Amino acid sequence: MTFGCLVDQYDQLVASSFGSNSRILEKHLTEYSAKTVGKALTRSDHWFTQEMIRRFEGVKNPRDVKLNRDFVSTHQARVCAVLEKIPIGKVTTYGLISNHIGSGPRAVGVAVGSNPWSIFVPCHRVVPGSLAIGNYSICGTLGENGSTTKRRLLLHEAVPIEEDKIDSTALWNPSEGD
C-alpha cells in the first residue's frame, strides 16, 4: 500500500490518499494539488504520511492534525465535521447524517465520497442504512478493492462485522452525540 499527503505552507493537511498503485496515487494528489494549493506531495518519511500509515494500521491515540478547509464547500465541511465525531469502533449511516444536518442523503453521499482527507477524516465509518459495509473510494475512484479496504479499516477499529454486515450495536447516531 502506498500513502501520500498534500500539505500547505502552514503545515496543514490539504489532502491525503492511499492505494496499491503509486502512479495512480501520485496522479490523483498532483491533480488535486493543481486545483488547490499548487504544492508538492509530502515525502514518505514526512510525519503526516507516517501518521496516516499509523492510523491505517489501527494504532490508537492518533496525533492531532490540522486540516486546511479552504478548498471544501460549506456543505462538505458540515458533513466532515460530523465524520470527525464518529467514535472509533462505531459507524453511522448516510441517512442519519442527512437528518442531523438537514440535507439529503445523496448530497451527504457525495460529500463523504469526495472527502479529501482520507483516513484522517473517517469517511470509512459511514455505511448504508442496511448496515452493509458498502464501498470505499481510493484515489478518487471506486475500485474493486474498495469494500475490502473499508472492511479492513473497520476491523482495525474493532467494528463488529458478521459476513458483510455491521452489527447494529456499532451504530452511532450523530443527533444523540457520543
Regions found by a protein language model. Give the residues of each.
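Residue-level signal for pocket-adjacent positions within structured domains
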Residues: 60-62, 87, 121, 128-131
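A short glycine-rich, hydrophobically flanked beta-strand micro-motif that places a catalytic Asp/Glu
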Residues: 96, 109-110
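Surface-exposed charge patches
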Residues: 81, 110, 152
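Basic nucleic-acid-binding alpha-helical/helix-turn surface characteristic of O6-alkylguanine DNA
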Residues: 1-103, 155-178
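Major-groove DNA-recognition helix of helix-turn-helix-type DNA-binding domains
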Residues: 112-121
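Intrinsically disordered, low-complexity basic tails/linkers immediately adjacent to helix-turn-helix/homeobox/MYB/SANT
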Residues: 125-152
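Short, amphipathic alpha-helical segments
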Residues: 73, 102, 117, 144-147
